[in-house]
Amino acid sequence: MDKEKSCGAIVFRKVKNNIEVLIIKHKNGGHWSFPKGHVEGDETEHETARREILEETGIEVSFVTGFREPVTYSPKQNVIKDVVYFLAEALNYDFVIQEEEISQVRWININDADKYLTYNNDKGLIFSARTALRRM
């Protein structure tokens, strides 16, 4: 069994009295999810997440301390993938899309995220993010 490790984040911004999250639509599979990618070399989890968010969307982030949500799943036969997600506030809002992998990037209200996200794991992450943001 092969193991893979990726890191990413639920990226948010505050707009008036609302919170919006950043979602991406992948060209491969057409699913909506959060920015993430494989750990390279001796990168830390945060370094990987920061690099992947910037590469895929052009967004710089600041991580929320204390939020770390691991997810494990099997994307294909004989592969187990561990993904660590963080919660991060966007420092800029203009997209620069990684066109090789991403077809769309969008800000959506956090309360509408369940309608867009393809996978149940991501819907669970939104619940955790909402809970953490309420405590801030």
Task: Specify the residue positions occupied by each region the protein language model found.
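Conserved N-terminal beta-strand and adjoining loop/helix that marks the start
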Residues: 1-20
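Anionic group-transfer/hydrolysis microenvironments
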Residues: 10, 27, 111
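Surface-exposed, flexible loop/turn segments at secondary-structure boundaries
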Residues: 17, 29, 113
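Short, acidic/hydrophobic/Gly-rich beta-strand patch recurrent on exposed beta strands
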Residues: 22-25
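Short small-residue beta-strand/loop micro-motif enriched in glycine and branched aliphatics
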Residues: 31-34
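Unchanged
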Residues: 37-127
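C-terminal alpha-helix
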Residues: 128-136
